Amino acid sequence: SKSKDALGEESLSYEEELKAQKSILDYYTKSGCKDNEDVSSCGSAQLPAGTKFWRPLSSGCITENYGYRICPFHGKEIHSGMDMACGDHKIYAVSDGKVKYTGYSRGGYGNYIVIHHNINGRKYSSLYGHLAAIYVKQGDIVNKDTVIGLMGSTGASTGTHLHLNIYNGWYLQAGESASLTDPRNYINFPTYNGGAYARFADRTTYYN
């Protein structure tokens, strides 16, 4: 996984991660989960099994790729995910899953949502940042058609857009290892080379 120094400020601080993990622990304790019990199957709702990923907007454009960039806030850094704007501002879950956490990151993502997924038996997480509104809560079961929030410009943001992170593993899960990966490794998007924005008109069309 990338270090916070390399990622700059567009990531959760250690204090924010600890706060989120405490909230998550409290949630599962109140849901009746016992020590060493699998959190994907305890509580009020089980984590559903999915088969694929979908784009999180019904239409939009790519405005920033994953990887090294020059950030207006922090200089050269690794951009931890992909940025999307234009089009429809409703944000959908990228796959079936369970809402792990919703919160606010003052120095980075602003209003954000973390969802855990089980895709073909493998663990993944998705994070949606800079939201204007959040429509789900911790523990909610979602699918690809669930509108989870609205695109916004909260946190460290220069304009209305969605920031999407994908992790291998369950992010914010105590005792679990989760590493950032390029969302393009799992979700098909049109190519963006830093010039004209790369647009897409739906959630399914395949781009080479």
Where are these regions (language model features)?
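Short beta-turn/strand-loop junction motif enriched in small, turn-promoting residues
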Residues: 68-71, 98-104, 118, 147-153
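Short glycine/threonine/proline-enriched tight-turn/helix- or strand-capping micro-motif at secondary-structure
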Residues: 41-46, 61-95, 116-117
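Alpha-helical oligomerization segments with coiled-coil/rod-like character
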Residues: 1-47
